[in-house]
UniProtKB/Swiss-Prot annotation:
Keywords: Cell membrane, Glycoprotein, GPI-anchor, Lipoprotein, Membrane, Signal. This is Predicted GPI-anchored protein 33. The keyword Transferase does not apply. A lipid is attached at residue 219 (GPI-anchor amidated asparagine). Disulfide bonds: none annotated.
Length: 246
């Protein structure tokens, strides 16, 4: 009996202890409205802040709108549009150039060494090369005097070493080419056979004994004939060289 009473007392004490904080929490969330002068001051401060913010925002928005629409709107917009268009065009041009453009070969502007190399890389006969020079030298190169000696063969066109081709710009500066086909070198191929004269032969036959005087006379006649031929050839070469200005 005593135990039951004691247990009831303990339970009652615990329930009473839990009820006290609940009451304290209820008292903590209770708000009190300021009265009198404090309430008026709080209302005034709130109103002043709201009015200041509204006035400032409205003035800034009005100034920005006036500046954009009436003063700088059209002028600024046009300048920006032009700038963007120009920039796009420049970017496109830069992007389109991806590699260097190869310049077409023009024999009319080549020196003899370059022409010799070029002739080994193309397969043109004389007529084709003449036509190429006439159509790729600004229309001023003459097809009849190109200054190139071409020998047709299975391997294509080849140039002789004895000819030179020079291209010079015309006085007007229009890129016209003048071809100089002057021959700079002459090659003479001669074959010479020493034959005894008829008089030397008859003397040699008559004097079969082989005397030294007859042999000397025959040799002298042959040498005289040979010297005459050489002198004649030298005179011809000198005359031709003087005519050509060599």
């Amino acid at each position: 009996m005593r135990g039951i009473i004691l247990l009831s007392f303990v339970l009652t004490s615990c329930l009473a202890a839990d009820a006290v904080p609940a009451a304290a929490d209820a008292a903590a969330v209770t708000t009190t409205t300021p009265a009198g002068a404090a309430a008026a001051a709080a209302t005034t401060a709130t109103t002043a802040k709201a009015n200041t913010a509204a006035t400032t925002n409205t003035a800034a928005a009005a100034a920005a709108a006036a500046d954009t629409l009436t003063t700088k709107g059209t002028t600024t917009g046009t300048a920006k549009t032009t700038g963007v268009t120009t920039g796009t065009a420049k970017t496109t041009a830069t992007t389109a150039v991806t590699s260097d453009t190869a310049v077409a070969a023009n024999p009319a502007t080549m020196n003899p060494s370059e022409l010799s190399i070029y002739s080994l890389t193309v397969t043109m006969n004389q007529a084709q090369l003449q036509n190429f020079l006439a159509t790729h030298s600004s229309g001023a190169a003459t097809a009849g005097a190109t200054g190139t000696s071409v020998a047709s063969g299975a391997s294509g066109a080849s140039l002789e070493d004895s000819t030179t081709t020079t291209a010079a710009a015309a006085a007007g500066g229009n890129g016209a080419a003048t071809i100089d086909d002057t021959t700079k070198g002459l090659t003479f191929v001669t074959s010479r056979t020493l034959k005894p004269s008829s008089s030397a032969t008859s003397q040699g036959s008559a004097q079969a004994s082989g005397s030294g005087s007859n042999a000397s006379q025959a040799n002298a006649a042959g040498v005289y004939s040979t010297n005459s031929v050489l002198v004649f050839v030298s005179i011809c070469i000198g005359f031709i060289g003087g005519s050509l200005g060599i």
